[in-house]
Amino acid sequence: MARTLAELPKGSRITDYISLGVVAKTFPVSTVKTVLEATGRNSRRQRDLPAHVVVYYVIALALYMQSSYREVLRCLLEGVQWLLNPTDRIKVTGKSGISQARTRLGAEPIKKLHDQVVRPIAVEATRGAWYRAWLLVSLDGSTLDVADERANEEAFGRPGASRGQSAYPQIRFVSLVENGTHVLFGTQVAGRRTGELALAKGTLPWLKPGMLCLADRYFFGFEFWQQARATGADLLWRVKKNLQMACEKRLADGSYLSHIYPSQYDRQPQRNGVAVRVIEYQLDGVAGAEPLYRLLTTILDPELAPAPELAALYHERWEIETSLDELKTHLRGARIVLRSKTPELVQQEFYGLMMAHFAIRGLMHEAALKADEDPDRLSFVHAVRVIRRKLPIFPAIPPRGDSDVSR
């Protein structure tokens, strides 16, 4: 397992490495305290680490995964005095004390804060976020390695390998991504033994009318299609080429209308069918391209969304691959595992990681709007460095409504 740094370079301060104001602006102290109260995790007595400080600590852990627990806390406490009562004297506790504080907090309030705050952020002026009147979102999933502890293995499982088992247990997660901003939202996480489709069903409450959701062929099934369609969002999903699709009406743009059915039993008498539009195309001259691509969409009128545009649009789905790469590589750095040693704290750390990614993407979106640029043209790695770099102290001053943070 990769070693963590015992300490940051000499002379380091929190303002050299993190602008807590960016995180606190995204996750205001008042919201954090409301969530803690709702989940019964607010500090009832004076502790070395108040619960709301631990929340920010969990997010900071995601930004500094190569630093030790104690070093992240030391630096954090240098920069969060406005979170504390002026008379508080919070000491930099050891690894055991930090673990106890995180265990008291648990995963529930972190997930609740994530679910309450993390959502699409694109506005009308956001470049690359829209196709005609639709907000573009994609659905996909991935896995992350977690610490090689028996409790984690029992809770999450580990993948097989050509020579025995994989070195690390893994969690699986499925997320929606806002294509234009790369914000991951509606994220669901479980052990590796849980399939992507089961997790994907948990993302559906975040699909809304006015969205166009793109997804790969492995998510398609009649039941899940109907559940996603019921959200009011429009769908553009790839399906396997062996799916039987009858051309019932050829349209001027080359696409055609057809029906999908709950089962083969319903297909023969054409019973309980649902109308779809089918787009089929090839990628000539593209290395590694498959012989045929087939897409289904809920948008039946070709004038609203012509087939050539939808075919090109589908490949926007790979925006989520960029977001997953940011999460797994650029934000985590060289570390190969989430370091928490119990299943509860793994989930806590995971949602802290998701919130750190959201805070960075929010900062990048603001910068893109000011520069009138597509957020894709900005560097995620550079944004991480900006948040870690020394910034003026005033961004860390809480908004007027959060002036009672010492209580």
Feature locations, PLM:
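A short, well-structured juxtamembrane/interface segment
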Residues: 118-126
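DNA-recognition alpha helix
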Residues: 68-87
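Single, function-defining residue in the core of a domain
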Residues: 1-69, 75, 103-105, 112-116, ...
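Major-groove recognition helix of helix-turn-helix-like DNA-binding domains
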Residues: 85-105
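Short helix-terminating capping/connector loops at secondary-structure junctions
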Residues: 90, 130-131
